[in-house]
Amino acid sequence: MRKPRSTLMKTAGMAFAAALGLLGSIVGPSAGVAEAAPTGIRVSDGRVVEANGNEFVMRGINHAYTWYPEQTTAMADIAAKGANTVRVVLGSGDRWTRTSASQVSGLIDQCKANKVICVLEVHDTTGYGEDGAATTLDKAADYWISVKSALEGQEDYVVVNIGNEPYGNTNASAWTGATKSAIGKLRNAGLDHALMVDAPNWGQDWSGTMRANAASVFASDPDRNTIFSIHMYGVYDTAAEVQDYLNHFVNNELPIVVGEFGDAHSDGNPDEDAIMATAQSLGVGYIGWSWSGNGSGVEYLDMVNGFDANSLTGWGNRFINGANGIVATSETASVYGDGGGDTGGGTAPNGYPYCVDGSASDPDGDGWGWESSRSCVVPGGSADTGGDTGGGTAPNGYPYCVDGSASDPDGDGWGWENSRSCVVAGSGADS
């Protein structure tokens, strides 16, 4: 799991990552051009959305199922705290006990019963290349194909996280080819779910490998339905590092989730406040590590003591009840039928999301607010209508520009708002 590194390695690695990130932003292809077929959870313009097009921002907790299968109430307990996602640790049988297809089906049923999205991950790949007991992404793909019967038809509820932290700090550059190959193998086998891929370097990508190659990995997926996951521990001990990494993905329309993080770690002191605040401001998902059951000196990462939902640790209380935490920011997936409505969540008739904080997000009283780095509609306000002027969708499928021609300095009918292209109503592009 979170492997310690030297300070020198961190400094050199982050400098290299910054250089690679700059190169990628110059020459990398735009990943937001192609979109997945409208089935299940998918990627659209660099955002994670549900089948109905509603954006879904993960606010979840990791659960170590494969080591604690007897903790049968954990899923319900996590959901009761307000999480909308549970990332579930599975075993492929290569290192840890294999999670069978029937067990996978049971876990998905639990997710659905508790109205959370299931991110299912194979943990046996952790630290491959540096940890001799770890297995390959190719073997992880074989596992997913072997439990295909449990996954089919569950695309609305399940994200397949191919392999946890699939490379350590040895030969991390091989991550790109191995990840592309695993994605292709799963697509060729008929798995059309949203896929999630973890970064190398024990998930922390201090080498910048995922950052530099994410666009090409995304483009290699014929479904264009791959979500990137960064794990933020000691490498991300300043707000600047957190913001730089997440902003790179958002600005390049590459879907990113913080798949693991904590408030402390043996390799440094992660800035959990910056992680949560930045994720909230960008509309990026996060999944904290972990509910309970940690050992080997990292017991401080438990959110509850001994799987007791009524015994929150300091980390658990901060993550669940603190600023930008689960209680304040989590919204249930709309596939469950109660994740929206018209009071603080859901989608307005003009296609824009409702403001979670209502009129508090609208200081000038025009009916439009600003949350998660995008415009939102105040329920019941003057903007809470349909039409094609200042919201809604143009005939070509792109949203209309809220600010009209003000968003179109070159006068070609196309504007740029909320990190995506928009159409100026009545312009030459409005067709």
Feature roles, as predicted:
Residues 71-129, 137-142, 180, 184-190, ...:
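Aromatic-lined substrate-binding rim segments of carbohydrate-active enzymes
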Residues 11-17, 34-52, 58, 172-184, ...:
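N-terminal presequences and immediately downstream first alpha-helices
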Residues 32-85, 325, 331, 335, ...:
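N-terminal carbohydrate-binding accessory modules
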Residues 67, 97-101, 133, 137-140, ...:
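Solvent-exposed, acidic/flexible segments
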Residues 2-34:
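Secretory targeting and sorting signals
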Residues 310-341, 374-384, 422-428:
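A recurrent domain-boundary module in secreted/ectodomain proteins
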Residues 40-41, 68-72, 137-145, 149-159, ...:
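Extracellular glycoside hydrolase catalytic/binding regions
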Residues 345-431:
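Extracellular/cell-surface secretome signature
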